[in-house]
Amino acid sequence: MIDLEIPKKFVPLVKQAGSMADEVFRPVSRKYDLAEHTYPAELDLVSALIDGMTDSGASNGAGAAGSTRAKDGTDQAPASTDADEATGVTKPASGTKAGKVNKNGANMSSALSIMQTCRGDVGLTLSIPRQGLGNAAIAAVANDEQKERYGNRWAAMAITEPDTGSDSGNIRTTATKDGDEYVLNGEKIFVTSGERAELVVVWATLDRSLGKKAIKSFVVERSNPGLKLVRLEHKLGIRASDTAAFVLEDLSLIHI
């Protein structure tokens, strides 16, 4: 039988996210819907709160940086949870049946908290600094040195293209090796928080003839002169969240 009750360990997180939706997001939701492209300054406090919860382990893995991938492909639990050191799988809480493990605790905590904040305002939820799709990608696959360098910075994700949509296996943006550098050329659209973020994780292909196997992701500084902002979209909804379009023109990245 499917149990639809919220696990007890997540109840405090859900209540806190619900309070944020009611007390922070709802009062300013209409304001930022009308003031499209204006950054919601209230989110600075929200992001600081999330950072503090993540650092303390109180978030139970919620948030972009809350879950990394173990070598076996399971979600690694945050440091404060009871997890097996070898697999990163959360052990059963006291009182639960032996043999049961939670392989998706971080995903569940993120989903439950996002459900609450989206009730407050979807656009504001998508605009929380350091909680972008790019941050989730960095947390999931970056090495320790990359996490140290980029972990505390806001990262957007650039996958979608005008001619391919979000079909990642058909990406046309290219990354060409040139000595110690990669040179990226192409176009990206529908980049959530692309103009506001400090970094953009760009998906590009090393060789179009190889299909998905040649698709790689590159962390690009938003200030890189080769990453040119074309426009911010004017939308019918979710207007508190900016959606950007970029052109990459001979964007140079040093291969480290």
Stretches found by the model and what they are:
Residues 1-128, 149:
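Amphipathic, small/basic residue-rich leader segments at the start of a protein or domain
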Residues 96, 114-115, 122-145, 165-168:
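N-terminal glycine-rich flavin-associated loop
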Residues 102, 127, 163-166, 190-193, ...:
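Short Gly/Pro-enriched turn/cap motifs at secondary-structure boundaries
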Residues 152-161:
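A short, Trp-centered hydrophobic/proline-enriched beta-strand micro-motif
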Residues 175-176:
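A structural signal for short hydrophobic beta-strand segments in well-ordered beta-sheet cores
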Residues 225-250:
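Flexible, small-/acidic-enriched active-site or ligand-binding loops
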Residues 254-256:
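Conserved small/polar residues in nucleotide/adenosyl-binding loops
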